Amino acid sequence: MKVTLIAILTCAAVLVLHTTAAEELEAESQLMEVGMPDTELAAVDEERLFECSVSCEIEKEGNKDCKKKKCKGGWKCKFNMCVKA
C-alpha cells in the first residue's frame, strides 16, 4: 500500500515538474518568435531585479515584512531579488 502511494505521488510530482518546464519553454519560444533580442530580455530581467529589490528595501525600512508584490509572471522575490520561480 505504501509503495503504491509513493509511486503515485512520485508520478504526480514528475508530471507537475514536466508540465511547468514545458510551459516555460513554450513562453520562451513565443518571446523569441516575436523577435525580442536577448539584450531586451536581459533588460527586462534587470528591471524586475531592481523593482523587487527597491520594493523590499522600502518595506523593510518601514519595519514591515517584505511582501513580494513586484515579481510576477513566473518570478518570485528572494533575498531582495527577483528570481525565476
UniProtKB/Swiss-Prot annotation:
It is found in: Secreted. Its main location: secreted. Expressed by the venom gland. Keywords: Disulfide bond, Neurotoxin, Postsynaptic neurotoxin, Secreted, Signal, Toxin. Residues 23-48 form a propeptide. One of its GO terms (molecular function) is toxin activity. It holds the Pfam family Toxin_20. Disulfide bonds join 52-66, 56-77, 71-82. Residues 1-22 form the signal peptide. GO terms for cellular component: extracellular region; host cell postsynaptic membrane. Belongs to the neurotoxin 12 (Hwtx-2) family. 02 (Hwtx-2) subfamily. Postsynaptic neurotoxin. This is U4-theraphotoxin-Hhn1e. It comes from Cyriopagopus hainanus. The lineage of its organism: Eukaryota, Metazoa, Ecdysozoa, Arthropoda, Chelicerata.
